[in-house]
Amino acid sequence: MAVQHLLFGVRRSCTFILACRRTAFQSSRAFTSIYTQFKVTDTKNIFRPLVFPVRVASAFTFTSAAVAKDVLLFEHDRTRFFRLLAIFCGGQFLFWAYLGHFAFTSLRDTRKYSEPQKVRTELGGFFSFDMNLGSNAWRYGFTSGCLIIGGGILALALLFSRRSVSRVILHKGGAKVSVYTQSPLGPQRSHHLTVPLSQVACYAHRQESHSFIPLKVKGYKFYFLLDKEGTVNNPKLFDITVGAYRPL
C-alpha cells in the first residue's frame, strides 16, 4: 500500500514538471514573438519619448556689437618713437632746404664775364658729358631736387604718422567707430576720425598679418595700420566689428 502511494506521488510529480516545462516553453515562444514584432515595427519610435528638443544658439549671439558703453578695442602708444621720427625728418628737411638755398644763391652763371668753366663727367666709363655748374638750368634743377627730397621725407613721415593707429574705440550702441592716429604730441592731441561702423573694413585677419593689421576706411586713401605689438582688449568684439571684412 505504501509502495502504491509512493508511485502515485512520483507520477503526479512528473506530470506537474512536464506541464510546467510545456507552459514555460509556450510562454517563451510567445515572448519571443512579441519581442520580434516589437523590434521590427517600433524600432524607429522606441526612443522618441526620450528625445528632447534643444536649441543651440550660434556662437556669435553671445557677443553683440551693440555695446552699452564706449569700448576700447585696440591701443598702442608709440609717442616716443614718433617724436624721434619727427626730429629726424625735421632735421632732414632743414638740411636739404639749406642745401637747396646754398645752391640757389652760390651757383652763378659766369658766361657773361668770361668763358664758362665746364666739368667733364664720366659715368661708369660708358659715356661722358660736360656740365656747366654755373648755368641756370643746373642751379634751378639742383635747388628743386633738394627741396623735393627734403619735402618728400617730411611728407612720408607725416603720412606714416597719420596712418599709424594708436587707439580704436567702439562707441555706445556699436554704430560708430573712432580711430586715433599716432602723434609726436601725445595720444591726447592726436588726429582722430569718427565714422560709421559700416564704412570700416579689415582686409586681413589679425592672426594672418605678421606685422600690421590693414584697416580700410571709406573715403580715405591708403590703409590705416594697426601694429601687431599693440593690445586688442576684446578679440571677439574686435573680430565682428572693426576686424570684419565688408565690401566698401
From Swiss-Prot:
The chain crosses the membrane at residues 46-68, 84-104, 140-160. Keywords: Membrane, Mitochondrion, Mitochondrion inner membrane, Transmembrane, Transmembrane helix. GO terms for cellular component: mitochondrial inner membrane; mitochondrion. Signal peptide: none annotated. It is a multi-pass membrane protein. InterPro entries: Tmem223 (IPR026100), TMEM70/TMEM186/TMEM223 (IPR045325). One of its GO terms (molecular function) is mitochondrial ribosome binding. It holds the Pfam family TMEM70. It comes from the Eukaryota. GO terms for biological process: mitochondrial cytochrome c oxidase assembly. Its main location: mitochondrion. Mitochondrial ribosome-associated protein involved in the first steps of cytochrome c oxidase complex (complex IV) biogenesis. Stimulates the translation of MT-CO1 mRNA and is a constituent of early MT-CO1 assembly intermediates. Belongs to the TMEM223 family. This is Transmembrane protein 223. It comes from Danio rerio (Zebrafish). The gene is tmem223.
